[in-house]
Amino acid sequence: MSVISMKQLLEAGVHFGHQTRRWNPKMGEYIFTERNGIYIIDLQKTVKKVEEAYSVMKDIATEGGTILFVGTKKQAQEAVEEEAKRSGMYFVNQRWLGGMLTNFKTIKKRIERLRELEKMEEDGTFEVLPKKEVIKLRHEQEKLEKFLGGIKDMTEMPDALFVVDPRKERIAIQEAHTLGIPVISIVDTNCDPDEVDYVIPGNDDAIRAVKLIASTMANAIIEGKQGVQTEA
């Protein structure tokens, strides 16, 4: 049985691309037709590409690897966080801080600081400090949690990135390429598919479309992890 059906893709509006004037000619092979000034994505190709990405994700998880979900645009934030958590993976859904991968040493120091603040809160340090200082520390903690909360358990480089909208997440993709980390991404008709290792042609602007594809990728990870457990 297919991991995703044409019916599911249609219902979620995955086939709706961008206006024809905002397109990248390199996406031509994934476009089925044009309707009312909007490109319609060929869902038969999307099904094949989802299956390909599913297999990659599943294999990484079976090998005990990790995947970083990246989606900072409003339509992606919730799905990226939920599906990463559901599959026990990491996520960035607020803002990609330059160097999150290429300068991971520095990011790790910020994560250590976040852990330190969490410990201070847990062990009662906050209760004995002056109120003004606690307010300042809490503010620092909240800020770190907001931007780094989804990767605070990530101890080393991920084995792949799952990205929603490569145009929006260009810096993340550049960093992944620099480090030789493969990128799996939902690619809309206005994006450049050459920047992505595993293209999933689809609507990256509709919450339901993003949720459907992100949850399918999370399912792949969960299935892959079960493979690890059964082999163990």
From Swiss-Prot:
Q: Name one GO cellular component term.
A: cytosolic small ribosomal subunit
Q: Does the keyword NAD apply?
A: no
* Lineage of origin: Bacteria, Bacillati, Bacillota, Clostridia, Peptostreptococcales
Question: Which InterPro entries has this protein been placed in?
Answer: Ribosomal_uS2, Ribosomal_uS2_bac/mit/plastid, Ribosomal_uS2_CS, Ribosomal_uS2_flav_dom_sf
State the family named in the UniProt similarity comment for this chain. Answer: Belongs to the universal ribosomal protein uS2 family.
Query: Mind listing the UniProt keywords for this protein, alphabetically?
Result: Ribonucleoprotein, Ribosomal protein
Q: Mind telling me what this protein is named?
A: Small ribosomal subunit protein uS2
Taxonomically, the superkingdom here is Bacteria
One GO BP annotation is: translation
Return the Gene3D superfamilies for the record. Glucose-6-phosphate isomerase like protein, domain 1, Helix hairpin bin
Tell me which species this is from. Answer: Alkaliphilus oremlandii (strain OhILAs)
This entry's Gene Ontology molecular function terms read: structural constituent of ribosome
